[in-house]
Amino acid sequence: PEKSSENESYSLRAQSQAVPVTRVAFIGTGASASASEMVINGQLPFLGAATALIGSNTYGKPVGQIARDRSVCDDRFRIVAFRVENASRQGDYYTGLASKMASTCQAADDIGRPLGDPAEASMRAGLDFLAGRACTPISGQSARSGANRGLLRPTKPSAAQYQLEGLF
């Protein structure tokens, strides 16, 4: 039998106490994947150009896995078992979401500032988008490529951070 016969769809109804959303800024990096991308992609059919990806392109993982153990030889298989789509049946973002978004704003991942600090580059770009101000789009090359792997480093490391890589 076809596995597609086991597909399930879930629809959410509007709630009377819901706040009407006018614009949403999603902050992401090359390390944003899977569930984060699922949330962003799920909003595109409903909010369209009122959403923006802030930061850099996402990882590009519109699939999920299941684990299957083989006790005979102590192996574990990670099987790609499902692909995620939104209400418009869009789900081919294997190179990240930047090329699928109507609006993007390039910003550095400023790990030297506290989460939520309006002076942090990604937060500032997100607030600018929400206020209707212009921003620099995520560049074409970074919009097409997946995650850039590498150690996160502060822009201006302290003496201790310089000596001990990975210290925050």
Residue ranges, per PLM feature:
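C-terminal "post-core" interaction segments
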Residues: 1-168
